[in-house]
Swiss-Prot record:
Sorted UniProt keywords: ATP-binding, Kinase, Nucleotide-binding, Transferase
Nucleotide-binding is among the record's keywords: yes
EC number(s) per entry: 2.7.2.3
Cysteines paired by S-S bonds: none
Protein name: Phosphoglycerate kinase
Catalytic activity: (2R)-3-phosphoglycerate + ATP = (2R)-3-phospho-glyceroyl phosphate + ADP
Keyword Transferase listed: yes
The organism of origin for this protein: Pseudotsuga menziesii
First-level EC class: transferase
One Gene Ontology molecular-function label: ATP binding
Amino acid sequence: FLKPSVAGFLLQKIGVIESLLEKFAVGTESIAK
């Protein structure tokens, strides 16, 4: 079973990746226009 600290760390990593993907998507949209 995962420790709470490990789960929190993974969730934080996922959040960072999602924000980077969102910024990348916005960037590609502005380029496509």
